[in-house]
């Protein structure tokens, strides 16, 4: 299915931003080799584990902590004085299975090239129970994201964050659905007013009766809400 989609002419959300004159960036620290499909997705620039400048240790499967990924994005793209409007996809890895090595937050000013994380994978005590370890990883990942936004978000910043799939069955149990929560965060109330008709739950936790959509439907709903004819 992946080969089928990248051989198609489907318009991606990132390509839509590129056509509108935005700079489009993908930060994919899990990638350890070239990803030519990035151009099909509409990304002007792709960063991966080879060019993000990380000099610290791996955390199990994870090539670098989320706090470093966000720091590198700020240094390389978002914090540049000469940049225009930017649309970026950032893949945050620290909550990914198997949760056997989870980072801790450090002072943002100490992150540097990641050398400050030396010894942390061995030092941090991770719970043996998978659900507890998963919860710890989610707490870390969201803390990294939210504190980054507190430091570097602006009045114009809009964040859409979601998981691309549910965790392993050791956490969810055998009968879990494929549903994942998605949240839009913005300082400008007008941004959220555009999606009132979606009937999403305020806050970070969807209500039991919150609408459930296929992920592929998000593009059209988003472009309709925020396009020139959006309400």
What are these regions (language model features)?
Residues 1-231:
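Solvent-exposed soluble domains appended to multi-pass membrane proteins
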């Amino acid at each position: 299915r992946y080969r089928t989609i990248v051989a198609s002419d489907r318009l991606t959300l990132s390509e839509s931003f590129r056509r509108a004159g935005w700079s489009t960036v993908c930060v994919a620290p899990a990638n350890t080799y070239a990803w030519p499909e990035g151009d099909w997705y509409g990304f002007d620039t792709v960063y991966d584990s080879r060019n993000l400048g990380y000099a610290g240790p791996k955390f199990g499967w994870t090539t670098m902590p989320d706090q470093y990924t966000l720091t590198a994005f700020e240094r390389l793209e978002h914090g540049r004085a000469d940049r225009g409007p930017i649309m970026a996809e950032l893949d945050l890895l620290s909550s990914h299975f198997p949760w056997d090595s989870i980072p801790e937050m450090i002072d943002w000013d100490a992150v540097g090239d990641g050398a400050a994380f030396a010894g942390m994978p061995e030092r941090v005590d991770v719970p043996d129970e998978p659900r507890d370890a998963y919860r710890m990883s989610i707490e870390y990942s969201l803390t990294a994201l939210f504190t980054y936004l507190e430091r570097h978000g602006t009045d114009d910043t809009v964040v859409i964050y979601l998981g691309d799939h549910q965790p392993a069955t050791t956490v969810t149990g055998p009968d879990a659905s494929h549903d994942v929560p998605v949240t839009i965060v913005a300082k400008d109330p007008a941004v959220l007013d555009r999606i009132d008709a979606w009937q999403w739950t305020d806050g970070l936790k969807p209500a039991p009766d919150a609408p459930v959509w296929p992920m592929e439907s998000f593009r059209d709903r988003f472009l309709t809400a925020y396009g020139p004819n959006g309400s």
